[in-house]
Amino acid sequence: MQRTQIVDALAATAPQPVIRLCGWVRTRRDAKGFSFLEINDGSCLANIQAIVDEGIPAYANIGAVSTGAAVDITGELVESPGKGQKWEVRVQTLTLLGAADAETYPLQKKRHSDEFLRSIAHLRARTNKYGAAFRIRSEAAFAIHEFYRERGFFYVHTPILTGSDCEGAGEMFRVTTLPVEGSATPASGNRYENDFFGKECNLTVSGQLEAETLALGLGKVYTFGPTFRAENSNTPRHAAEFWMIEPEVAFADLEEDMNLAEDMTRTVVRRILDRCAADLDLFNRFVDTTLVERLRQIADEPFARCSYTEAIELLLKSGKKFEYPVSFGLDLQTEHERYLAEEHFGKPVIVYNYPKEIKAFYMRLNDDGRTVAAMDVLVPRIGELIGGSQREERLDVLEARINEMGQNLEDYWWYLDLRRFGSVPHAGFGMGFERLLMLLTGITNIRDVIPFPRTPGNLEF
């Protein structure tokens, strides 16, 4: 018999004489002559109640059906006389698919700490909080693909292994087949020419440069995949492995780039509000009681916008004492970003035209010679959600910027070719997917919105 998901069973419009469900037992409660099972299969937040009568043959083994056990049941879907849900199942057959020892199964019917659940990340998807978080993660990923498809973008794949450093920060994971001892260093006698690719190889920090090459042939593209940063930051906002959404648009300027970033953010928020009401309600009740209200504001109201220069002036006039200094030429820190988004504007704000010294070489130099056509989207409770720019399309200016940043022109010969052959204005941005999920759920630690977090000192699973 075909299996029905619990989300569909609970949405039934009429009783069913026979239905088959599979799932994990959340609780078992025994009464005289029968037992109540709460079963969840991950398809939704809600459990379904199954009533097992002592008259069925499988009832003899009901003692083995403990919290965490996997079961396969068939029975009649009937209206539930109790409050809380419309349907329940009167079990006709019950098969124990996988037992779970009640003494050692780590998930019991109580609220576990996030720290404890990170230590059993292989099981935490069975909890209400993390089941909801990962369903929202799935729905958000689908909404992003949907957004770009509706607007004529092509989804492209960029390499994980790379010989270039998009950010120029040098915080990259090295990949090598050379002996680990000494790796490719002069002292070890190992050379990059002896390595697998014959040159230095790293895990990508961004698919942007490669996406630009595809945009300057396909017009509008986006990439959505994993990126890696060997940044030894043990903070709630940083992970060594995370996912990025990176669109690139030919013939676009900074204004179009900012419009796209805002449109994408608001559209995805709107779709999560529409499609994940039950899961959002969980986070609104137990994680952040202002979550849904804040998401509705993001969906409904245009973002604020101000230049970097204006942002610095607002921070200086705020009267607040910040931990990090505020001055033209210094990058905005998280405390500055959050003040602008939370306290001054009270909603997301796009800050644009940053000093060239604090931005990457590929960002277009403005006519003032001091700033670049860069933008960041700052959101309440998080800070930076998106970073983007109009890309530098002028060959001579780009070469000068690469030299200024101490990069090797030869490493970017293919990137410079884009400016030699039919160069056009173009723009793009990167959004950290996990930061978007923190915005959508109210979860404050990036380790809790990705199934298996990779952070300094943590490589389990």
UniProtKB/Swiss-Prot annotation:
GO process terms (BP): asparaginyl-tRNA aminoacylation
Keyword Transmembrane helix part of the UniProt annotation: no
Enzyme class: ligase
EC number: 6.1.1.22
HAMAP family reported for this sequence: Asn_tRNA_synth
CDD domains linked: AsxRS_core, EcAsnRS_like_N
InterPro entries for the chain: Aa-tRNA-synt_II, aa-tRNA-synth_II, aa-tRNA-synth_II/BPL/LPL, Asn-tRNA-ligase, Asp/Asn-tRNA-synth_IIb, NA-bd_OB-fold, NA-bd_OB_tRNA
Superkingdom, natural source: Bacteria
Chief location category: cytoplasm
NCBIfam families: asnS, PRK03932.1
Subunit structure: Homodimer.
Protein name, UniProt field: Asparagine--tRNA ligase
Family stated for the protein in its record: Belongs to the class-II aminoacyl-tRNA synthetase family.
Source organism of the structure: Nitratidesulfovibrio vulgaris (strain ATCC 29579 / DSM 644 / CCUG 34227 / NCIMB 8303 / VKM B-1760 / Hildenborough)
MF GO annotations: asparagine-tRNA ligase activity; ATP binding; nucleic acid binding
Record keyword Aminoacyl-tRNA synthetase present: yes
Keywords for the protein's UniProt record, in alphabetical order: Aminoacyl-tRNA synthetase, ATP-binding, Cytoplasm, Ligase, Nucleotide-binding, Protein biosynthesis
Subcellular location: Cytoplasm
PROSITE patterns registered for this protein in UniProt: AA_TRNA_LIGASE_II
